[in-house]
C-alpha cells in the first residue's frame, strides 16, 4: 500500500498536475482499490448487466442489418433477374417499332383495297363464264 502511495506521490511531483492535489487516500484505501473491491463484491450483478446490455445491442444490430447469407441469396436472385431482364430486352429490341406497325397498317389497307378490286374482277369473270357455260349448254 505504501509503495503505491509513493509511486503516486512521485508521479504527481514529476508532472505537477492540478489533479495531484486530490487526496491520495480516502479512509486508508485508495479510490482504485475501492473500485476493484466494489467490482469484486458485485461481479455477478455487473457481469449479468453487461451480458444483458451486449445481448440487447446484438439483437438490435441483428434486426437492423442483413446477414451475409441473406445478402448472398439476394445477390443470386438479382443475378437471375438480370438474366431474365436481358432476355426480355433482347425480345423487345426485336419487336417492330411504331413506324413499322404504321407501315404494316398502310400495307394491309392497300391489300384490302386490292382484294376488293380483284374480287369485283373475279365476280365479273365468273358471271361471264357462267353466261358462256349457259350458251354452250343451249347449243
Curated annotation (Swiss-Prot):
Q: List where the protein spans the membrane.
A: 43-59
Identify the GO cellular component terms for this protein.
membrane
Q: List the subcellular locations.
A: Membrane
The record ties this protein, via InterPro entries, to:
Phage_Mu_Releasin
Instruction: Write out the entry's keywords from A to Z.
Output: Membrane, Transmembrane, Transmembrane helix
**Topology in the lipid bilayer:** Single-pass membrane protein
Against Pfam families, the record matches this protein to:
DUF2730
Q: Identify this protein by name.
A: Uncharacterized protein HI_1498
Q: Which organism is it from?
A: Haemophilus influenzae (strain ATCC 51907 / DSM 11121 / KW20 / Rd)
